[in-house]
């Protein structure tokens, strides 16, 4: 995959502190890792709860539970961010 691929991150609501909302705090590390690798990142909210999907060229290349991503940070120590980056790099 070229270094300047457009990656769409589709994410759903999740429950925290008794409320269910769209929150982007758990996506900070994922966005940072993808941008550092030269990719353009677009965020899209979806109706599904607790899900993150990475879309490259119209194809879903990675999916995980949003609550399993590390909160905040740069994503360098989060193993799910490394898996997601690998999936984007090997997408075609």
UniProtKB/Swiss-Prot annotation:
Pfam families according to UniProt? UPF0728
Organism domain of life = Eukaryota
Family recorded in the similarity comment: Belongs to the UPF0728 family.
Q: What is this protein called?
A: UPF0728 protein
Q: Which organism is it from?
A: Branchiostoma floridae
